[in-house]
A protein has these predicted regions:
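Juxtamembrane helix-break-helix junctions at the cytosolic face
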Residues: 3-4, 78-97
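N-terminal signal-anchor transmembrane alpha helix
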Residues: 9-37
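Residues within membrane-spanning alpha-helices of integral membrane proteins
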Residues: 11, 15-22, 69, 73, ...
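Juxtamembrane non-transmembrane "cap" segments at the membrane-aqueous interface
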Residues: 35-46, 93
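Juxtamembrane membrane-water interface segments that cap and precede transmembrane helices
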Residues: 49-64
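Alpha-helical transmembrane segments of helical membrane proteins, especially in multi-pass transport
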Residues: 65-84
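Hydrophobic alpha-helical transmembrane segments of integral membrane proteins
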Residues: 91-129
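Alpha-helical transmembrane segments and their membrane-interface exit regions
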Residues: 129-141
């Protein structure tokens, strides 16, 4: 069954899941409001108001939180594009695409571990799915 699966289909599917991950990170994570919980509101207010010097720039923890969230979104969009392009390469030259597929697979496995340790179930599930798809694409790209 696995030998009949085309690596480019697996890569395109992983690519679309990366796009979904980027959209969820942005709209459900960065741009969503609070639950209204007083403790949560207090933490967010402190993150937005307490300033400190960061290498000569006055910043807040909110700046870092929001900025790193945007960095993650941009990186996931880049991965979406790269996996989509890698799918085209896997169609014509799977042996050349294979090391890149392996690198992305390892990265998403590491992302899943970090999400399990520091975040929550939604990114963890997406990252596990992407890692599995990439692992299958890696195995199928031998031919």
């Amino acid at each position: 069954m696995v030998k009949d699966v085309k690596p480019h289909i697996l890569l395109r599917t992983a690519s679309v899941l990366s796009l979904l991950h980027a959209l969820l990170n942005t709209f459900a994570g960065l741009l969503s409001g609070t639950s209204g919980n007083q403790e949560e509101v207090a933490v967010l207010n402190a993150m937005k108001t307490v300033q400190f010097d960061a290498m000569g720039s006055l910043r807040t923890y909110w700046d870092f939180y929001f900025g790193f969230g945007l960095f993650l979104t941009l990186n996931l969009l880049l991965i979406f594009a790269l996996l989509w392009q890698l799918a085209s390469l896997a169609k014509t030259a799977p042996a050349i695409a294979r090391p890149f597929i392996g690198s992305f697979c390892i990265a998403f496995a590491a992302f899943a571990i970090l999400s399990g340790l520091y975040f929550f179930i939604a990114p963890l599930i997406l990252e596990i799915l992407i890692a599995v798809l990439l692992g299958l694409a890696y195995a199928c790209a031998r031919r």
